[in-house]
Amino acid sequence: MQRLVATSVNTVTLQEVEKPSLKAGEILAQTLVTGVCGSDIHAVQGHHPFVPVPYNPGHEVVGVIRELAPDVKGFAVGDRVTVEPDLPCWDCKNCNSGQENLCENLKFFGCGYTQGGMADFWTLPATRFHKVPESFSDEAAAMIEPLSTPVHAVKLSFIGSKDLTGKTVAILGCGTIGLLTLYAAKYFNAKTIVMTDLLEKKRNLAKQLGADMVFDAASKTLPSDIRQAVGQSIDVVYDCVAIQQTVSQAISLADKAGTVMIVGVPAKEVTVPLPIIQDHQIRIQGSATYLPADYHDSINIISQPSFKAKEIVTAVFPKDQAQKAFDTAIAGEQIKVLIRFS
């Protein structure tokens, strides 16, 4: 079988490897499609804070079950599936309190793990699998994992409320995670949704998919422009870029008493105006991956007629063009790039 390996900075190659053997409690799946995530881009460029090259990429994976260990129940050969790629220890404080996404001994399939989803076959514990609804295309199914990340972030931002009813929110970045955050914010009843991006075509797509207002992220007067347009500060800002410029913009937009959610994966450290954060009671909240309930919400969102997977998945490459797929994703002109394995 073949597995894609990020062998060095900006280089991925298909390698011949042995098919993984099945262990107790595991499922062996064959890959259909895998998404190139923003974290894959950071990692292959040598910028990811926790995933050095070489590594085995691929965690936004959709596959078909080919084998099951005898003790696995609830699944069958032929089921189409996606996975929760985080692999908790199930024994630490956080795992025992329902926060297995924050496991103190966490491993992550496709991010520094011995296997990744950019391979013909792979194995994982059955506890990490979710069945894909028959009505979903492979492209729509490939959105379940990445959508679960903003779903988790949006739910963390409720702060005692049941949803976003009455809230004005801003989403910084109109890439995959930004657009999926748009869907999550709409699903949880945000009143007004403002989005920003450097690229006009991405801003136009955000508007097409339901953003109330869009703004050029390069504007030097962005925070004041948005404040003037919405008539108030922003209740919740979802930073899906997580660079110095967007973090600074987010804090300005949330001033005063707002919340800033860090949704994107930062490639490096940033600085924040701590006196303003303290004095103006601005809340900055990180958000790490997801929980099983977030997958259920994601499936519900994708099931809605308003969800347009074809508008988000803008490029699909066969596995023998994986280098081109990564180069295309790195260039930043596309939204979501997929690699098809079978």
Regions found by a protein language model. Give the residues of each.
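Nucleotide donor/acceptor-binding cores
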Residues: 1, 166-167, 191, 258, ...
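Glycine-rich beta-strand-centered segment in the early N-terminal region that forms part
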Residues: 20-34, 47-93, 133-135
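NAD(P)H dinucleotide-binding glycine-rich loop of Rossmann-like/cofactor-binding domains
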Residues: 89-172
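Mid-domain Rossmann-like dinucleotide-binding core that forms the NAD(H)/NADP(H) cofactor-binding site
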Residues: 136-219
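Glycine-rich cofactor phosphate-binding loops and adjacent beta1-alpha1 units
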Residues: 159-165, 204-283, 323
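Residues in the short beta-alpha loop(s) of Rossmann-like NAD(P)-binding domains
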Residues: 198-199, 266, 290
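C-terminal hydrophobic helical "lid"/dimerization subdomain
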Residues: 248-252, 292-342
